[in-house]
Structures are given as C-alpha cells and as structure tokens.
Amino acid sequence: TELSGAPLDLYQYRGQVLLIPQFTGLLYQKSQQEGDVVDGLPSHQFHQY
C-alpha cells in the first residue's frame, strides 16, 4: 500500500530495482562487506536533467 493507504500496483515498477525500507539495514551490511555503497536519496529532489 501507499503511505495514503491506497493499494500500490508493483507492476508499474517492472524492470526497476526497488529497495524495500524494511530490508535496507540488511542490504547495507551485506553490500558494505562486498565494497558496494547503498545511499538513500529523495526520489524527486534530484530529478533534474
């Protein structure tokens, strides 16, 4: 569901990588060990071309 409580159709994100907030900490720990970087950025703040 969306923050508003409305149903969210995940099909609209087909082909994209999604990071589920509940798993962020686990992913960060795993990726840090592998030398990767996980960063959280606001979705539209940097949407400039």
From Swiss-Prot:
Protein name as catalogued: Glutathione peroxidase
Organism superkingdom: Bacteria
Thermal effects: Optimum temperature is 40 degrees Celsius.
Disulfide-bonded cysteines: none
EC number(s) reported in the record: 1.11.1.9
One function term, GO molecular function aspect: glutathione peroxidase activity
Enzyme class, first EC level, given as a word: oxidoreductase
Its job: Glutathione peroxidase which may protect the cell from oxidative damage.
Catalytic activity of the protein: 2 glutathione + H2O2 = glutathione disulfide + 2 H2O
Regulation of this protein's activity per its record: Inhibited by Cu(2+), SDS and DTT. Activity is slightly increased by Fe(2+), Mn(2+), triton X-100 and EDTA.
Keywords from the named record: Oxidoreductase
Entry similarity comment: Belongs to the glutathione peroxidase family.
Keyword Acetylation: no
Activity across pH: Optimum pH is 6.
